[in-house]
Structures are given as structure tokens and as C-alpha cells.
């Protein structure tokens, strides 16, 4: 019973200090949460010196926290013409 009340109080304090913004919490580090996509919805936690923020919705699917999409995009890089030419260059350097 006491644990439930304590948990409810902690959640209430966290929610009270949390602000959801579209653009108010943007910064260089917050934008990096989305990788190459841009963030459309930030979740900000107000701290004493400033704000700690995280992106909760990216504008595109390219989200670093979605493992399948990242793995797919990394695997797709192996088959680009630039990567093939770099592989050929590496093979040529190995022969020397």
C-alpha cells in the first residue's frame, strides 16, 4: 500500500515537471535523438540549470531506436556503388 502511494507521488511529480512541446525544447543534442530525421515532438524535463529533452516522435521512420530500420539502412549501404568501389579499392590495396 505504501509502495503504491509512493509510486503514485513519484509519477505525479515527474508528470508535473514534464512539459510536452513541439519546438520549445529544440537544441543540437535533442535533434540528434532522431538521427537524420527531424523531431516533431519533444518531451522536456525541466531541471535546475536547464532542460533535459528527448524526442518522442520523429518526422520520418529513420529512428535510431528502431533497430530493424537502422540495420536495414546499414545493410543497404553495402550495395551502393560508392561502397562497391571502396571495397574494390580495399581489395587492390591488399594485393600490394
UniProtKB/Swiss-Prot annotation:
Residues 61-96 form a propeptide. InterPro entries: Myticin_preproprotein. Keywords: Antibiotic, Antimicrobial, Disulfide bond, Secreted, Signal. One of its GO terms (biological process) is defense response to bacterium. It comes from the Eukaryota. One of its GO terms (cellular component) is extracellular region. Residues 1-20 form the signal peptide. Contains four disulfide bonds. It is found in: Secreted. Hemocytes. Bacteriolytic activity against Gram-positive bacteria M.luteus, B.megaterium and A.viridans. This is Myticin-A. The lineage of its organism: Eukaryota, Metazoa, Spiralia, Lophotrochozoa, Mollusca.
Amino acid at each position: 500500500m505504501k509502495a503504491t502511494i509512493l509510486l503514485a507521488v513519484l509519477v505525479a511529480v515527474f508528470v508535473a515537471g514534464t512539459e510536452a512541446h513541439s519546438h520549445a525544447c529544440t537544441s543540437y543534442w535533442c535533434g540528434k535523438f532522431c538521427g537524420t530525421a527531424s523531431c516533431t515532438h519533444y518531451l522536456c524535463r525541466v531541471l535546475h540549470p536547464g532542460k533535459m529533452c528527448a524526442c518522442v516522435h520523429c518526422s520520418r521512420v529513420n529512428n535510431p531506436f528502431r533497430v530493424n530500420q537502422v540495420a536495414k539502412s546499414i545493410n543497404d549501404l553495402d550495395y551502393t556503388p560508392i561502397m562497391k568501389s571502396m571495397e574494390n579499392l580495399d581489395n587492390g590495396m591488399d594485393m600490394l
